[in-house]
């Protein structure tokens, strides 16, 4: 799901309201849980104050879906996985209200395994979200392929021991040399079924 316009709109307004450098905030937040970013930029605040701020920001992000859409190739890829009976999950740094709202706006199907911020103590770039996703799928992390566009997500997938495909990731994202594939679009992915697992081909 491409929610970049919504994310940057919400956080830009939040940064301006607190007199913070907007670009500095935007450079930090991508792929991370909102609560992680709030704790980073509100170092002198109490946890209660941070939680109140989070509740307000969460409501803003959940209600604003203008510009949210499925990435090119995402719907076809998920349909192909379902046709081949290959299990898949969504592992997001968004909370339930935010992630549910954006998924609905994108028109993509909701998976059986949907990992959100509330389900892990440590979010991306820590490995916990993808470790939980693999566990819920009933697979070893090494048997899972993570598709990510954010630096924090790439680091999380690698730390979990998954194979990572970076799609339209920032050129300066760390550890890009360790990902299995680096692509510009999901349209380039073609998936086939093997006796055990899946085969991924790339259309250049």
Model-derived regions: residue spans:
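Small/polar loops that bind or transfer phosphate-bearing groups
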Residues: 2-3, 29-30, 90-91, 148, ...
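N-terminal helical cap/lid subdomain that shapes the substrate entry/recognition surface
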Residues: 1-84, 97
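A generic secondary-structure micro-motif detector
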Residues: 1, 24, 67, 89-92, ...
């Amino acid at each position: 799901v491409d929610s970049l316009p919504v994310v940057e709109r919400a956080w830009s307004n939040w940064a301006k309201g607190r007199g913070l450098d907007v670009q500095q905030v935007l450079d930090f937040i991508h792929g991370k849980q909102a609560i992680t970013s709030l704790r980073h930029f509100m170092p002198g605040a109490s946890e209660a104050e941070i939680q109140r701020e989070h509740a307000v920001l969460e409501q803003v992000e959940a209600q604003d879906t203008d510009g949210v859409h499925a990435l090119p190739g995402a719907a076809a890829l998920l349909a192909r996985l379902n046709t081949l009976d290959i299990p898949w999950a969504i592992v997001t740094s968004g909370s339930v209200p935010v992630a549910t709202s954006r998924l609905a706006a994108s028109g993509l199907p909701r998976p059986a395994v949907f990992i959100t911020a509330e389900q892990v103590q440590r979010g991306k770039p820590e490995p916990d979200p993808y470790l939980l996703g693999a566990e819920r799928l009933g697979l070893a992390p090494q048997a899972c392929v993570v598709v990510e566009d954010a630096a924090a997500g790439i680091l999380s997938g690698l730390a979990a021991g998954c194979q990572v495909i970076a799609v339209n990731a920032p050129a300066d994202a760390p550890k890009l040399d360790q990902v299995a594939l680096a692509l510009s679009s999901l349209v380039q992915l073609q998936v086939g079924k093997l006796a055990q697992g899946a085969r991924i081909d790339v259309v250049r």
